[in-house]
Regions:
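Preference for intrinsically disordered or flexible, low-complexity segments
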Residues: 1-136
């Protein structure tokens, strides 16, 4: 059986208070085979990215570049993959991406697959978020 997060993309509808509810998955709650602790709390800041980093190539970063971002253009591990909103069928806007190797509370690191990137998207018309990840 495939885990819910292996079915891509995952979609969530957000109510007026921003609380999410899953769209398209009503199966049982499943635990991962290799569980990992929650992400470690961190203080983050936003900074305008210099034009030089507008486009980044995942294959050239070698874990030396910050591939976590809000807005801008995604840094695709594979081919570009913009999901369509399951409610209105519009192409969803890119919202954010999170790179692998994020520290967890149990001393480990969070990996998207074998060390890829997770991408978040948003449909403002429907209040729907979409998430997918890519790895090699």
């Amino acid at each position: 059986m495939r885990l819910p997060w292996e079915r891509q993309p995952l979609f969530y509808r957000h109510d007026p208070s921003s609380s999410p509810s899953s769209i398209g998955y009503d199966g049982p709650r499943i635990s991962p085979q290799f569980p990992v602790g929650p992400l470690r709390e961190a203080v983050v800041g936003l900074a305008e990215t210099p034009r030089r980093w507008f486009w980044q190539v995942w294959g050239c970063s070698n874990s030396r570049e910050n591939l976590n971002r809000i807005g801008g253009e995604p840094c695709w591990v594979q081919d570009a993959e913009y999901p369509r909103c399951p409610t209105c069928d519009s192409v969803m806007a890119f919202l954010l991406e999170l790179d692998s190797n994020l520290p967890t509370t149990d001393g480990g690191e969070w990996l998207w697959g074998s060390g890829g990137i997770a991408y978040g998207f948003w449909c403002d018309l429907c209040g729907v978020s979409g998430f997918l990840w890519q790895c090699t």
